From Swiss-Prot:
S-adenosyl-L-methionine binds at residues 56, 85, 104-109. Belongs to the RNA methyltransferase RlmH family. The keyword Transferase applies. Its EC number is 2.1.1.177. GO terms for cellular component: cytoplasm. The gene is rlmH. Specifically methylates the pseudouridine at position 1915 (m3Psi1915) in 23S rRNA. This is Ribosomal RNA large subunit methyltransferase H. Its main location: cytoplasm. It is found in: Cytoplasm. It comes from Prochlorococcus marinus (strain MIT 9515). It comes from the Bacteria. The keyword Metal-binding does not apply. One of its GO terms (molecular function) is rRNA (pseudouridine-N3-)-methyltransferase activity.
């Protein structure tokens, strides 16, 4: 079973669009333990060495929601950190240190919208792992 307290999002920049911020806040109410860190740049040294690092990038691998659930469950009790870059993406040196490059879709999304989609998918993954009826395949 996945819990939000094992998952963190590290993102470059703050959400400027009110409707996206409101959407993220709706999911945060359902997952108050989910940590979302917004900053001007990534400091990979602040992420513990034994944590799993997943970079969201267009060249990453795509998964269905159930496949992503299985993948995250395989990380057992490790903390999982999702990294989302700004409009320029994630620097290659950080991608090189990640455990997985993840693509949300073959479509390209603005980074703010990608953050909302990721938060929804995290909620969905937690719901799937808990047997909640939220996800209907």
């Amino acid at each position: 079973m996945l819990k939000a307290n094992r998952l963190s999002i590290y993102a470059i920049g703050k959400i400027k669009k009110k409707w996206i911020r409101e959407g993220i806040n709706q999911y945060k109410k359902r997952m108050p333990d989910l940590i979302i860190n917004e900053s001007k740049s990534f400091n990979i040294d602040n992420i513990r060495v034994n944590n799993i690092i997943i970079c969201l990038t267009e060249e990453g691998k795509s998964f269905s929601s159930t496949e992503l659930t299985s993948l995250l469950l395989n990380f057992k009790n490790k903390k999982i950190n999702f990294l989302i870059g700004d409009a320029d993406g994630i620097p290659s040196d950080i991608k090189d240190k990640s455990h997985l490059l993840l693509s949300l879709s073959p479509l390209t999304f603005p980074h703010e919208l990608a953050r909302l989609i990721l938060v929804e998918q995290i909620y969905r993954v937690i719901s799937i792992s808990n047997g909640s009826p939220y996800h209907r395949a």
